[in-house]
Amino acid sequence: MPGYEPFLLCDFHVHTRWSDGRLTLRDTIDLYGRTGKFDVIAITDHILMKRDLLARAGRVATLGRCTFGIAEDQFPAYLEDIARESERARRQYDLLVVPGAEITQNKLRGKKNAHIIALDIKRYISADQSPDDILKEIRRQGALSVACHPHHRAVRRLEISTCYLWDHRSALSGLVDVWEAANRDDLFSVTSLKHFPYVASSDFHKPKHLYSWKTLLRAEKEWPAIRKALCANVDVALTLFRKDSWNPNGTAWTGALRPAALGRLRLRPAR
């Protein structure tokens, strides 16, 4: 019945070996699918600036084994790979896979850095243009934009700051469709204080990142309905996906406490 669709467990920020992820696209889909928990994931590998110094250093450090981003001439093959694997994911796991990309601007001055996800991307978008031009191109393609980790992180202090979109929110908020309120282990409460539409995602690069903040939303398991739900941002919630403890039917604990923790547990009578 419309309006009473089940909540979907979603991760809209996932990287594979097409950029700097640890797993192949196929293995990534199998990892999510075999949990039996996930309904929707978006593959969002990096599109880098031509002179990305961090990626250049990374390629040297990995002896060229990792490219860290998708080149323009590789992009059609990237979308074809996602399309092929998305059919298998839906058939084998009833998992909806959305094609995306993270248009990544890493500059020497942290205040100029912006990472923008395009969900349901159709064509390559260059990172060598202004953030507002990137956002406008995402709109032209009919894709959905997500501002990635838009504020200072409290946990991963060694990673670069990507605050450009937030610092210029008065000018850009009309072009940004959704903001990350949580990214892996970090919460960005500032986005909710402004009442911006929000999501929570893992920024997945390796298997342990599976256990992190995720999005719950109420919609049919089809991209047009999910897009509409994300933009409306009414039946949307954040959930922390933990190993062996997430229950889609409620909040009941299904894991186990260690004996030491049981010894410290004190139950109070209901008032």
Annotate each PLM feature.
Residues Q105, H152-V155, D186-L187, K206-P207:
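Short, catalytically relevant binding-site loops at active-site mouths
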Residues S161-D186:
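Structural recognition of alpha->loop->beta junctions
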Residues P2-R140, A181-K194, Y198-S201:
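A metal-dependent hydrolase metal-coordination microenvironment
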Residues N113-A118, V155-S170, S212-L217:
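Short, surface-exposed, charged loop/turn segments at secondary-structure junctions
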